[in-house]
Amino acid sequence: MSQQIKIKVSDKVEGIVERDIQNNVANRRELYIKLFHIGSGTPSRKELVKAIASTFSTAEDLVVVKKVFTNYGSGISYARVNVYKDKDSLQKLEPQYLIGRDTGQKIKKGGKSAQKQQ
């Protein structure tokens, strides 16, 4: 069994990579991470993106946090993260709303006000 990769998110939050799958077809690395944050809240997506980008020596805009799940009161979270090799693959495969969440951008939806303007 290979060595587990440790991720330090902050002073109170650390994690380990439980599964690391190299997906060559999608040109990405799929990570399943177990986060320990006992005594503090669930880490934010931005904190996770920064920590994962620094751990795997990649740009922050190539990291997409798919999901973060925490059981009530446990202090342990599970995160599902994709780390892409290039921006083109990320744009083709990930939904725009997820890309916007991780970068902090607001993506306008084409609601009723957008239809009235046309």
Swiss-Prot record:
Keywords: Ribonucleoprotein, Ribosomal protein
GO cellular component: ribonucleoprotein complex; ribosome
Organism domain of life: Archaea
Keyword Transcription assigned: no
Any one GO molecular-function label of the UniProt entry: structural constituent of ribosome
Keyword check for Transmembrane helix: no
Family listed: Belongs to the eukaryotic ribosomal protein eS24 family.
Listed name of the protein: Small ribosomal subunit protein eS24
Species name: Sulfolobus acidocaldarius (strain ATCC 33909 / DSM 639 / JCM 8929 / NBRC 15157 / NCIMB 11770)
